Amino acid sequence: MKLTCMMIVAVLFLTAWTFVTAVPHSSDVLENLYLKALHETENHEASKLNVRDDECEPPGDFCGFFKIGPPCCSGWCFLWCA
């Protein structure tokens, strides 16, 4: 019972603390992040997800011994790239 009451008080305290220390205009920060993400989706060259590593081996090529990660494009090496 005491533990439950302490947990409730702790949660209420932490909730109040986040509201007290919150940035007054945090919605502007979120809006700027949204606009930046929108700009990157419109400009595909700016997106870092579109970068392709052409130095990897295609499936079926010999890659060596057991590895996870490069040099295989899939990331799996079991003597041949999977």
Swiss-Prot record:
Signal sequence annotation: 1-22
Disulphide bridges, residue numbers: 56-73, 63-77, 72-81
Annotated keywords: Calcium channel impairing toxin, Disulfide bond, Ion channel impairing toxin, Knottin, Neurotoxin, Presynaptic neurotoxin, Secreted, Signal, Toxin, Voltage-gated calcium channel impairing toxin
Tissue: Expressed by the venom duct.
GO cellular component: extracellular region; host cell presynaptic membrane
Transmembrane regions: none
Top-level taxon: Eukaryota
GO-annotated molecular function: calcium channel regulator activity; ion channel inhibitor activity; toxin activity
A Pfam short name: Conotoxin
Function: Omega-conotoxins act at presynaptic membranes, they bind and block voltage-gated calcium channels (Cav).
Family from the record: Belongs to the conotoxin O1 superfamily.
Domain notes: The presence of a 'disulfide through disulfide knot' structurally defines this protein as a knottin.
Protein name per the record: Omega-conotoxin-like MaIr137
Organism: Conus marmoreus
